[in-house]
Amino acid sequence: MLAYTTLGVTDFERANAFYASLFSIIDVGHVMGNERIALYGTDVQNPMLAICIPYDEKAPSAGNGTMVAIRAGSRAACDELYAKAIALGATCDGPPGERVPDFFYGAYVRDLDGNKLCFCQMGAN
């Protein structure tokens, strides 16, 4: 259903480096973009995450209650993505752990611009 989700950033180069390094863990890469937007995914036919300098050139803001959940593929990958994000300068918004017994495992961070991300594994690992 979703084609892509966009997060506004304050420093495009810094954010691009953050997401490129972070997503290398789950074999997700830069699939398209230009000088103000970069889209990450496996290809343009699958859901992507975009980062951009807002088109109106006003300051971006992280939404209260807004979060992007990234399917990690395993609990170990959730842990690895979380650790990598923290090492790259993200802040903890909920350490890795089981949130719904035997079904949902997640780890939460705020990226360099305060956008909330969840690295998750749903179902059996």
Summary of predicted features, one role per range:
Residues A15-Y19, A85, G114:
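Conserved active-site tyrosine of GNAT-family acetyltransferases
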Residues L7-L49:
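Core segments of cupin and vicinal oxygen chelate
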Residues M1-N16, V68, G123-N125:
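N-terminal beta-strand motif that seeds the catalytic metal site of vicinal oxygen chelate
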Residues M1, S61-N64, P101:
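Short glycine-enriched loop/turn motifs at secondary-structure junctions
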Residues G41-E80:
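Long, continuous compositionally biased terminal/linker segments
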Residues I86-N125:
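Vicinal oxygen chelate
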Residues A38, T66, F103-A107:
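Short beta-strand micro-motifs in enzyme catalytic cores
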Residues S21, I25, L81-G89, D93:
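Charge-dense, helix-prone N-terminal extensions
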